[in-house]
Structures are given as structure tokens and as C-alpha cells.
Amino acid sequence: MNVTKPATQRPKLPSVGRLGLVDALAGARLAELGWTEHDDQAHVDLLWSLSRAPDADAALKVLVRLAENPDTGWDELNAALLNERSLRGRLFAVLGSSLSLGDHLVANPQSWKLLRGKVALPSHAALLESFVDLAEEVAAAPASAVHRLRALHRDHVLVLAGLDLAATVEDEPVLPFTVVAAHLADIADAALAAALRLAEKTVCRDRTPPRLAVIAMGKCGARELNYVSDVDVIFVAERADPISIRVAGEMMRVASSTFFEVDAGLRPEGRSGELVRTVESHIAYYQRWAKTWEFQALLKARAAVGDAELGQSYLAALMPMVWTACERDDFVAEVQAMRRRVEQLVPADIRGRELKLGTGGLRDVEFVAQLLQLVHGRSDESLHVASTVDALSALGEGGYIGREDAANMIASYEFLRLLEHRLQLQRLKRTHLLPEFDDEEAVRWLARAAHIRPDGRHDAAGMLREELKHQNVRVSRLHAKLFYQPLLESIAPAGLEIAGRGMTSEAAERQLAALGYEGPQTALKHMAALVNHSGRRARVQSVLLPRLLDWLSYAPDPDGGLLAYRRLSEALATQSWYLSTLRDKPTVGRRLMHVLGTSAFVPDLLMRAPEVIQNYGDGRTGPKLLETEPAAVARALIASAGRYSDPLRAIAAARTLRRRELARIGSADLLGLLEVTEVCRALTSVWVAVLQSALEAMIRANTPEGGRPLARIAVIGMGRLGGSELSYGSDADVMYVCEPASGVTDAQAVKWSTAVAEQVRAKLGTPSVDPPLEVDANLRPEGRNGPLVRTLASYEAYYAQWAQAWEIQALLRAHAVAGDAELGQRFLLLVDHTRYPPDGVSAEAVHEIRRIKARVESERLPRGADPNTHTKLGRGGLADIEWTVQLLQLQNAHEIEALHNTSTLESLDAIAEAKLVAEDEVKLLRQAWLTATRARNALVLVRGKPTDQLPGPGRQLNAVAVAAGWHNDDGGEFLDNYLRVTRRAKAVVRKVFGS
């Protein structure tokens, strides 16, 4: 009797789709292997095992290639796969994770047997023996040496990968990361030993080989190696003779062509130095010439192969120097430079995918561990360990970082290293780059290879994305916390939640000094003041400070920044929004720390205009600091001052809005959000608004109630005010013109207008905590000796008869900025005949300008000033460029209307367009003007007061470089660029002036 199976009963063998196989040929490949012919439990288990491989299709393709190779012994392998779960786990995991190891198995088809049975990792000694024995064997047959040694190396990597990956497919033990990394270093040691033996045979033949020790550095030295990595080495010989050098060179050649790249770039003097040195030569170098990074590199040094006694002598001689490196004068500067160099190595477009150098990546963890080892290791031998994991553990045990934080950092580090291993295994290529996050197939493969499984809310790829985000954020937070939390614990009161073991005050001071603080004792006092009071503020500060202090340590002046933060926090103690904003908006905190740690000018403004801090965040269209238009600020300032009949209150209102706008401009400038031309225009706009407000207030004050002003007054901006090119420290150069009201004589109008103008100058110039508001009218006819205010007719008569060359030159930048606009325009039309005469200015006037310029260069530079670095009057500085432009205007403006312009930069454009000066030379002038203006603005931002002289090398110059928008905080590099740019511009200036 035939029994028909119910239609709903599913076959025991899973379908290709259920197995997750997506290759169109997958079904045919399974059939070719004979795995779909039987539906017994063994075949079902086999197929489900295959489906769990990170890339089951890739694994299946290699299995078919193995089946087709007669040397594989397919029947034996097939039977073993059906019956041995551990073999399935290792083999399928390897074939689904590593295309290169799959190719190795196809080329060496008997190597699958290495994954069979009770597989254990060989010891370091066993590895050395197997590699060296093979080297001895192949030395007589060099033609096969590379192939056989490489196959042995790959076999050992295969076994390790099989054990490392097996848990992704079957319920096999998980190998700890530390075991994997240490075994990879053991394999590397054995490979180096084999290469050394072959090199000795090749170079020395029957002679006794030289005593040569190979010191492993980097990850190999620390026994935390990657699957694919350069192996960094240093060679130490008893005698640095030609034989030793040849052996070392041959060893590198053999190892690099057979196993992995061997790099001796960490040796003294790097690639320019001798390949081999004696112990004594190494000692001499490290005592006299070595940089901080070279001592940092020695943290990982280990005698790997070669002469063991010589290797130990090297370590015994040099390691004590490592633990005193933090006492070197340049230690802090070099550490800060190393931090920045790492950050700048990664292009912005791939930073989020960089496992090693990206934010919250492996280098962040390694840098923390190594810096803290260097700082505290001189007084604590428990920190004398090589690997990152061991270092973090020791730092936790010693109280230098919290134990829980150390455990979390280790967990994040091991997770990121696991991903790095999986990425490298795929093609046995050196890489640290995660796949594009929208590459679903690649992300899914990596997740499965890393044994990440779906959780019900996310598939494996989604889980990996979430885990990466979590780990990067955790590392970034811990990066700050590990440096500063123990410091806070050492100063916090017992009642505060953060109080723990902390570290000694001496250790805390050492650590702060290493992080860039020149006054670590004072810094600790500031930190204590911030957390040593009761209530919510202290608790919030204790949470905020690790991150804020970390950001501050990247600023040019962390000492000044911490003081400014303390002052600001104390001033805003009653403002609940302040700490809440810093807590909830990291962007605000990061930007604020940069500003406080760079500038003395802006923090003083923020103390009295703290609301600007709320605009340090981002809005929907970008930074909130840029949402304010200077023109809108000017209108608001004039309107606010206009509400008061009392001139003092009106000017006070204008000062308040000016203060807020200066804080906004300075902040945006320091944060790199504004171009220098935008800064100059914004500063000019707010100055003009203040002038307008003050003028209106004084006119109201001098006009009887119900009466009318005796005159109309216009304020003419001169110099940089007229050109809309003011800097932070600029005075307002002005002239006043008046026109009598109906029925008022010229004399009455001038007297009344003079009183108004004097009051404007006096009230604005009243000493204040704000940046000064100096009004300078010395560019008026006859200078200080001439009347402060004139009528149009008086100006016309004077300029027609008495105008001197310098007065004509000054008029080139005259522009109506405040007061009666119509009167101002009539004044400009009047002086056009003087500054742009139809036939051009006289040759005598041009000659006089040249003479005055020469006198200015020799007499006006302040005593003691460096002419090369004085931004205003120095070589190729602002005065040089502006005088050059003005000379060309005087000579050519009567023919070229585009030169009727008060802006230096716009006039340079016109000069280039008219080909008065070669275009490349105009570019030099423009670059010098922009460079000097940035530097001059930066000087005020950094020092908090007007100054024109660049400082010498040191912290202040570094801060000026940062404030000027230089791409790093290397003040020397910034200064070199300034000198180069201004020197080239000076050559053009001399050419134009004919000198």
C-alpha cells in the first residue's frame, strides 16, 4: 500500500533560500558535492552549519574547488565534515571569512587536516623549532625555500583562524583576543627566527655568524599583533660591522618576501640611520638625540629572536630611560604634537570608518595607556608592561584610572581589534577601514564574522552599526574620563559621588603637566574650586569636567582656559541654563573650551554677555553664531539706544549690544566660522552703529525740548573705518562736516556741532571694562591743530588751496558712515575733485607720498619692535600694502573709475583688472594683507588688548597661530609662513615705489 505524504510536510533538507545562499549556482554546487542527495540528520546538520558561515556562498565555492582537486582526499574530508562538528565549525568559518585562506587550502589541499580533531595552539618553543628546522632544511634548496616557509606560516595562521572563528558556526570555545594576538606574535617570532637562520646561512656560509639580536617593536613587541601587520624591528649587534649589517638586511629581505613586511623605521634616526648599532651606540643616541615618541615606542620593545643575551643587555640599558622621558623639557610639547598628528592623519571623509585613527578608535585607547604609563611609570613598576590590555589593567589596579573604566576601555579595545582582525582575514591585507555603512552585504558579512547576531529589533548588520556607535562613543567619553576622573577624585570632597581612591597630589600634578598645563598646582586649585561645594552645581561640574578638560587640553593655553572657565562658572552660578547647556549640548562645550583656551579677549566679553554661549550650538541651518546678520545688529543697537533721552543711558545700551556682538564675532572667528573679510565688515558695522547712536544721543542732549538742532552733522569714516576693514583693536578715524539749519550762521553751527562731536568722543572714550571706543579725528585738515568740525564750504576752500599730499592720500578712504546721509554724500562728491582730480594728482604729490613712506618706515616703528613681525608697520605689513594701493590710486584713479574705492582688497582687484601690476604680484599683496590682518586680529583675541607685534616662539605665538586660523598650533610654522608671505609682498611694494 502506497502512503502519500501530506502536502504540508516539508522535506528535512533545508532549501537553498532557507540556508541564506544567494548565488544562482548554489543549488548546483550543493548537488555537485552530493549534499542534497540524502535527507538524513547528518546532512541536515551539515547544511545548517554551512549556512552559519559568515559568507556561506564563498565557503561553498571553495568546498567545490577542494572536491575537484584530486589531492584533497575529498571522500575523507566529506565523511569527516558529516561526522565531526568541530571540523565543520573551523573549516566553514575560515572559508566564509577568508578568501585568502581558502586559496591557501586549495593550493595546499592536505592542510584541512590541521583543523581536525583536538586542535591546540603550539607553544612559542614549538613554533620556533618548526620554523627553524624547516629553514635548515631548505637552506640547501633556496629555490623552494620561499614557497615552503610561506606555506608553513599560512598553515599556522590557518589553525589559529580556525580556532578563532569556529564559534561563529558551531558551539566551540571562544579564543580570547589576547590569546589570538599573542599567538600571532609567536608565529611572527618563529618566522623571524627562520629568516635570520637563512640570512646567516646565506651571508656567513661556514663562518660563525655575528652576534645579532632582533628587538621586536610595536604590536609584535607587545605580543598584541594583528593577522596582517608590518613587524617593526630594531637590530642590535655585538659589532656593527659589514657582516652584521648584511645579515640584518638579508633577514629583512627574506622575511618581507616570504611572510610579512619587516620595517626597521623605528631605529635611531629612522630610515636615515644605520641599520645595525651596538648597545653602546643605542645608549648614546637615546641619551642625546631621541625624541619623546622614540621613548614611547620603546614601551613595546621585546627581545624577540637572535642573541638573547645581547637583546636583554639592550633592554636593560634603555628601558630605564623610558621611565624618565616625562622629565624632558620638550615632553609636553611633543605629546601634544603627537595627539594632533594622529588626528590629522585621517581624511575627514573616512574618519567615521577608520578603526585605528578615527575618533573613538584604537589609537585613542593606545594613546591614553601609553601616555599614562610614561607619566606614572617612573614611580610605579607595575606599569612596566608592554601590551595595551595589560597597561590598562595595571593603570586600573594602581588607581590611575577607575577599575570599571579600565574594564570598559579594555572591552571596547578588544571589540575594535576583533573587527580589525576580521577585516584583515578576508583577504589577508593590512586594513583598518570599515566598509561603507550603506554597503549592506559587506556590513552583514563583517557582523557574522565577528559573531554578532540579530536581537529581534535589528538584523546582524544593524546590530553591528549600533555596537560600533556605542563603542566609539564609549571610547571617546572614556578617553576624556581616564585622564581627568582620577584627578577629580584626588581633590573632591568625601561627600561627592565621584570621590574614590584617586591618585596622589604628586601624580596628579605630573599628569596635568603631561597634558599641557604649565601650572599644574594652580590648575588643581581651579578644579577643586569647581567641585568643592555642596549641591547640584558640584555634581554637574564633576560630570562635565573630564570631558571639558579633555577638550581644553587641545587648546593652546589650557591654564588660561581653565581659569576663564572657573571665572565664568562662578559668574553664572545662578544661571541654571549654563551648566544644563554644557551638559546637554556637547558641541557648545567643545567650542567654549576652544575659545576659553585660546583667547583672553572673548572670555571677558562672555562674562558680561553670557547669552552668546547659548549660540555656540548648531541650528537647523548651521552654527547659531552665524544666524545673526551684522546689519540687523546695527539696526537693533541704534533702536535700543534711541529709546533713552539720557545720553549716558543711550550709550550704555549701545555698549551692551556692542559687547554682545563683539563676543559673537570673536567667538565665530576663533571657531573658524568667519572669513577675515567678514570679521572686518562685521566689526565696522557695529562701530558705525555705535557712532550713529552716540551722535543721535548727543544731538538730542544738545537740542532744547521742543527745539531743533542747530545743524545737520555727517560723520565721515577715514582709514580702515572708511574701507570697512576694521580690526578688533582699531580706533575710529573720522572727520565731521556740518551744515547750518535755516536761520543759523556758519559760526553758530560749527560751534554747536563741535560741542556735539567733542561729547561723542568723550562719552565713547570714557574708561570701561569693555574694549575701548576711541574716536580719532586727527586726519582732518591741519590735523590736531585744525577745527574739529567744518562746513562743506570750509572743506572746499581748504582742499582747493592748502591740501597736502598726506591729506589727499587720507581722502582716498573717506566714506560717509554716520549722521546725515545726504550731507555725507555731498561731502564725498566735493572731495572727489581733490582725491580723483581729472588730470591726476601732481608729480610733486606722488613724490611727497614716496618721501613720507620712506620716513614712516624709518621713524614710526615703535622702539624695540621687530620690523619683520610688526603686522602694521613692519616689512610687507598692512601699511606697506595699503600705501602701495593708495599710490596706485593717486596715479591712476583719474583714468580708472574702478579705483574710486575705499576698500584695499577691492582696489587690488581693480589694479589687477587694469593690469597696473602683474596679477601674480597682486596676489602676493592680497595674501600679505589677509595674512597680516588675520595675525593682527589674532593678537587682540589672544592677548585681550590692541597690539601689532607678533610674539616670539612659545605658547602665546602658538595661540596666535590657532586664533589666526592656522591649520595647527605650531607657532613656528605659522611665523615662517608669515615671514615668507610678507617678504614676497615687500618685494612688490619696493617695485611699485621704485625703491
Curated annotation (Swiss-Prot):
Catalysed reaction, written as an equation: [glutamine synthetase]-O(4)-(5'-adenylyl)-L-tyrosine + phosphate = [glutamine synthetase]-L-tyrosine + ADP; [glutamine synthetase]-L-tyrosine + ATP = [glutamine synthetase]-O(4)-(5'-adenylyl)-L-tyrosine + diphosphate
Keyword Nucleotide-binding attributed: yes
Cofactor or coenzyme needed: Mg(2+)
Pfam families for the chain: GlnD_UR_UTase, GlnE
Keywords annotated in UniProt: ATP-binding, Magnesium, Multifunctional enzyme, Nucleotide-binding, Nucleotidyltransferase, Transferase
E.C. code: 2.7.7.89, 2.7.7.42
Region (Adenylyl removase): 1-487
Family matches, as SUPFAM superfamilies: Nucleotidyltransferase, Nucleotidyltransferase substrate binding subunit/domain
MF GO annotations: [glutamate-ammonia-ligase] adenylyltransferase activity; [glutamine synthetase]-adenylyl-L-tyrosine phosphorylase activity; ATP binding; magnesium ion binding
Residue numbers spanned by region Adenylyl transferase: 492-995
Top-level enzyme category: transferase
A cellular component term, taken from the record's GO annotations: cytosol
Claim: RNA-binding is one of the keywords in the record: no
Gene Ontology biological-process entries: regulation of glutamine family amino acid metabolic process
TM segment ranges: none
Protein family membership: Belongs to the GlnE family.
Role noted for this protein: Involved in the regulation of glutamine synthetase GlnA, a key enzyme in the process to assimilate ammonia. When cellular nitrogen levels are high, the C-terminal adenylyl transferase (AT) inactivates GlnA by covalent transfer of an adenylyl group from ATP to specific tyrosine residue of GlnA, thus reducing its activity. Conversely, when nitrogen levels are low, the N-terminal adenylyl removase (AR) activates GlnA by removing the adenylyl group by phosphorolysis, increasing its activity.
Protein name: Bifunctional glutamine synthetase adenylyltransferase/adenylyl-removing enzyme
The encoding gene: glnE
